[in-house]
Structure formats: structure tokens, C-alpha cells
Amino acid sequence: MAEFVRAQIFGTTFEITSRYTDLQPVGMGAFGLVCSAKDQLTGQPVAVKKIMKPFSTPVLSKRTYRELKLLKHLRHENIISLSDIFISPLEDIYFVTELLGTDLHRLLTSRPLEKQFIQYFLYQILRGLKYVHSAGVVHRDLKPSNILINENCDLKICDFGLARIQDPQMTGYVSTRYYRAPEIMLTWQKYDVEVDIWSAACIFAEMLEGKPLFPGKDHVNQFSIITELLGTPPDDVIRGICSENTLRFVKSLPKRERQPLANKFKNADPDAIDLLERMLVFDSKKRIRAGEALAHEYLAPYHDPTDEPEAQEKFDWSFNDADLPVDTWKIMMYSEILDFHNIEQANEGEVLVEGAGTAPQGFA
């Protein structure tokens, strides 16, 4: 039986195994608090995420189960990896992952990025998305604060709590507004992996400009700002709008022409503009896919088709439509945690090679 110790962090009780020491708060989300810690077993710094009251409602239980299953399944250099998971005596759940020094949001607010860093970060984002999408998963909440970076410029996508199956009938209103694809705002359904490409494009533009591309005050303003740059949506996109209210709103907007992105990004490389044009497309079916984007000329310094893997198998979403009581989710969670530890013991000594390509020099 593991020995647990308690610590108070921002008024929140962290109840963790004695394997982890030197807790320091690093971030707070809607569903959990994240602390850095030292892993006494490996000597390495780690991030410990406490999931608040995971068994308080069936919805929270299912969300936690989904994130756990995804973190177990997704094994890729550009995706955050799970190193430990446990349930405390107080029945909180703790995810332990590798610790990266910063995130892209903090980086963007502290300094302008040079071209080679923008290329390398975008390359790694798309490399991770190619893998995730091949597993049948859509992240749905890609934004700079969910992109972690270390001092070697290794980049990892995190926070899969909102991720969903690839499904032409997806519903919901999920990602942070600035990075949200127009099809989510327009239809509230029928969206797929392309929503992540739109988010990646918004992040790419923010790296180029140093500020958000579409900083909408609300979803109406957000959509209006998008049309100022990209013009009025094409007729086939408008025909796909399901909500009468949304349809009336879109038709009420003045007709606008798409503006050349080169006019907005005056200092950007022409290849960067070309890739951005292919990512920022209203019609999601015409938006470039992650694998295609990796082969674009702008990313040529890092592109290696032999080192951009896809998932070996699709993620099992069979639980996703289940409407189960908390106790059932809890049993399923215990089973997954037990399975994780059995797999970890079997795989001891197996190490992922860190970092894709060769990082640019001079980043600190």
C-alpha cells in the first residue's frame, strides 16, 4: 500500500504518494490544479495534475475517464505522456506527466519568435496532430496554453479532457473562442479533425504577429472579425448551417471579399503565407490536412516523412455514448489504472526518443 502525504496548495489539499516531493503550483484549470514536483524514483521533475472531485457527477466521471483513456492510448513525442496515475484516499485522481518548462502562451507574451522557432513549433504541432487524427481523435481545444515547450524546444500538446471521436455529427461548443473553427460557431455539429487545423492556423498566425488573429469579444463579434479577413463564407458553407438564428445572422452580415493574407502579414515569409492560406479556409473539407501541411515547403527544414508516424490503431470510443452512474465509472477507472500500472511494469526500460528534427539553436 502506497504511503500518502498531504500538502495545502492554494487552499487545495494535495494528497499524493511519498514518491513525489517539493510541490509547487504551476497552473489552475477549470477541472484541476497542476503542481510541479520531484519524482524520488527517477530524480526527474514532473507535473502532477489533481482532478477535482472526479466522482461528484456522472459527467465529471466520464470526462476524467475519457482523459485517462486518451493519455494511455496516445503515445507520441509531441503528445504529453502519462508516467503515473493514482487515486488518493480522499478519492481524488492524480495524473503525473513529464514537466516542461513553459507553454506557448507564456512564450508569446514574453518575446517575439524568430522564423526558425515558428517553423519548428508549427512542425511539431502538426506532427502531433497527424498522429492524434490518425487515431480517430479530435483535440477540440487547441490553444497556446495547451502547447508545452521545454528548453530544448521540444513541444508537446496537452489537455485532452475535451477531445472527442471523429464524428460527422459532433455537437457542442467547446474550444477557447479565439481559436475556434467557424464550423463550430456556424453549425454546432458536423465537424471533424479540420477544427484542429483551424486552431493550429490561428496559433501559427499568432506566432507570426505576436497577438491573437481573431480576438472576438463574443461569438458574434468573433465571426464578424473572421469574415473581415476571409470574406463572406461560400454558399455551400452557408447551406450547411443548421440553426435558423445562425443562418439569419450570417445572411445579415455585409458581403465581404477575402483579403490577401500578405497584406496583413507584411513581414512574413511567402511560404508561411501560402501555408496559412491553405489552413485558414472556411470550407473545412478544403482545409489542408496535418500530413499534407507537414510536407509544405515552409516546413521543409524539419519535414521527414519517415519520422512522422501515425497511430498503430484507432482509439476505442465504445464508452463514449454510455450514460452510466458514478459507481460504474469509478470501477472502470480503477480497472484502467490497474491496467496502466501492469503495462508500465511490462514496458520498463522502453523510452521514447525526445524531440522531432533538430531544434534551432539559441533558444533560452
Curated annotation (Swiss-Prot):
Record-listed ATP binding positions: 26-34, 49
Family: Belongs to the protein kinase superfamily. Ser/Thr protein kinase family. MAP kinase subfamily. HOG1 sub-subfamily.
Domain notes: The TXY motif contains the threonine and tyrosine residues whose phosphorylation activates the MAP kinases.
Residues found modified as Phosphotyrosine: 173
Top class in the EC scheme: transferase
Position of sequence motif TXY: 171-173
PTM comment, free text: Dually phosphorylated on Thr-171 and Tyr-173, which activates the enzyme.
EC number, UniProt record: 2.7.11.24
UniProt subcellular location: Cytoplasm; Nucleus
InterPro entries: Kinase-like_dom_sf, MAP_kinase, MAP_kinase_CS, MAPK_p38-like, MAPK_Sty1/Hog1, Prot_kinase_dom, Protein_kinase_ATP_BS, Ser/Thr_kinase_AS
Keyword terms, alphabetized: Activator, ATP-binding, Cytoplasm, Kinase, Nucleotide-binding, Nucleus, Phosphoprotein, Serine/threonine-protein kinase, Transcription, Transcription regulation, Transferase
Regulation of its activity: Activated by tyrosine and threonine phosphorylation.
Chemical reaction(s) catalysed: L-seryl-[protein] + ATP = O-phospho-L-seryl-[protein] + ADP + H(+); L-threonyl-[protein] + ATP = O-phospho-L-threonyl-[protein] + ADP + H(+)
A Gene Ontology term for the protein's cellular component: nucleus
Active site: residue positions: 141
Function: Proline-directed serine/threonine-protein kinase involved in a signal transduction pathway that is activated by changes in the osmolarity of the extracellular environment. Controls osmotic regulation of transcription of target genes.
A GO molecular-function annotation: ATP binding
Gene that produces this protein: hog1
Modified residues (Phosphothreonine): 171
Protein name in the entry: Mitogen-activated protein kinase hog1
Domain Protein kinase: 20-299
Classification via Pfam families: Pkinase
